[in-house]
Amino acid sequence: MNHTIRVDRNHPACFILLLDQSYSMSAPMVGAAGLSKAQALADATNRLLMQLVQRCVLDEQGPRHYFDIALIGYSDRITRLLKSGDGFGNPLVSSPQLADSFVRIHEEPDGQSWPVWVEPLADGQTMMCAALDLAYDFAAGWVASHQDSPAPVVINITDGEATDGTLDDLAERVARLVGLSTVDGPLIMFNVAVAARAAEPVLFPNDAARLADPYTAGLFHTSSVLPTRMLEYVRTEADRHGLPRPGAGARGFVCNADLAGVVRALNVGTL
């Protein structure tokens, strides 16, 4: 139960990303000139998916089945953003399926390009509780058939409060999620609070002392303590970038996240 199982074809990982697509995501993204939060989040997610596929390619045979993934968008409704296409209605998409399911190629003026799986959306309210309910259904089904795999990881990225429940309702749903486990350990929960305005990001804290409001503190308390391998990676990256080193008990939580903070959280959560 120490989160030490390594990913391979016999032990695939499970990643479930929850993306806030409410109206407030139309506001500008801190640290991403000219981009809305919705566009910046879509770009970061698409780049992450591309990197995950690339990590699964070791030879000319194409991506190996190293992970299963689901993307859940939430606003006035809950949307499954990836389709498996396997004909069996599986809620999670395997890495080989993901490699073949992008909708278009995005090209930048400087020549950079990447596949697009997710388009930006910013409309309606913030049905975060319902998104967590669906994440539970997906994760519960996955752990039932993958007990020898690494524990699943759920990453929730939002810029506001849930409109379909209280903080207690949110905590209750996260408690159900982290109650799921494999032989590797319990499910790992990340929360990323996207910045509404320029402020010092709080990266992987071990207490809520620097958090400005009860709701943000509540998101912190519903985030998992980082397993050792994730904490070691976060500390190495902090040293490399001249950032404060997270202490013992650091959680999978980022507050006042600019674009760089979102990317760091995604990278840590999908180790």
Predicted regions and their residues:
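Acidic, low-complexity intrinsically disordered regions
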Residues: M1-L271
